[in-house]
Amino acid sequence: MSKVHVFDHPLIQHKMTIMRKVETGTKQFRELVDEVASLMAYELTRDLPLTDVEIETPVTKTTQKMIEGKKLGIVPILRAGLGMVDGMLRMMPNVKVGHIGLYRDPETLEPTEYYLKLPTDVAERDFVVVDPMLATGGSAADAISSLKKQGAQSIKLACLCAAPEGVKRIQEEHPDVDIYLAALDEKLNDHGYIVPGLGDAGDRLFGTK
């Protein structure tokens, strides 16, 4: 079964609390999503392989560590996932970015895919699927399935806020995909929103209703 990593760093908890506040405006919300995504990227890349390299400093020659040519990819689930991309790119500027477009049916709460664009070398990359909210888990599960159908072998899921129902669905449908969260909340309400959550992340990111 996939592992669930919930980040308890004080900076992440502080920023998540401000993000949750109903009075937090679009500009600040967008900045906070970006900042938390950057902080999460630090932990998401903890297991990257290192190799020894010979370099020369202004003082002497020395052997130091660098990341060993790992191919990475970030795949935001449109549209809210876009808010996490720049923060992660700041930490991993050379990664390729794919996109998966999904919308959730307001009646069934199930996702429908309308767009998919990925790097050509899918099988050679380690992917991180990003979406601020993991509610029912339907969109994330479908996005991961789409990646696998295209040949992806290594996938992680990174979300700001999750409900236990969404985590359970990912673990059941994709037990090989580890889940990285800034917060694991209590439950879903009758409308499919995470409680206490932070509202509709897409609307709050882009100033729409």
UniProtKB/Swiss-Prot annotation:
Binding site for 5-phospho-alpha-D-ribose 1-diphosphate: 79, 104, 131-139, 200
Cofactor(s) demanded: Mg(2+)
Pfam families assigned: UPRTase (PF14681)
GO biological process: UMP salvage; uracil salvage
Free-text activity regulation comment from the record: Allosterically activated by GTP.
Pathway recorded for this protein: Pyrimidine metabolism; UMP biosynthesis via salvage pathway; UMP from uracil: step 1/1
Chain positions recorded as uracil binding sites: 194, 199-201
Alphabetized UniProt keyword annotations: Allosteric enzyme, Glycosyltransferase, GTP-binding, Magnesium, Nucleotide-binding, Transferase
E.C. no: 2.4.2.9
Transmembrane parts of this sequence: none
Top EC group: transferase
Alphabetized InterPro entries for the sequence: PRibTrfase_dom, PRTase-like, Upp_B, UPRTase/APRTase, Ura_phspho_trans
Catalyzed reactions per annotation: UMP + diphosphate = 5-phospho-alpha-D-ribose 1-diphosphate + uracil
Highest taxon, organism lineage: Bacteria
GO molecular function, one term: magnesium ion binding
Cofactor note: Binds 1 Mg(2+) ion per subunit. The magnesium is bound as Mg-PRPP.
Disulfide bonds: none
Function: Catalyzes the conversion of uracil and 5-phospho-alpha-D-ribose 1-diphosphate (PRPP) to UMP and diphosphate.
Family under the similarity heading: Belongs to the UPRTase family.
Name of this protein: Uracil phosphoribosyltransferase
Source taxonomy: Bacteria, Bacillati, Bacillota, Bacilli, Bacillales
Gene name tied to this protein: upp
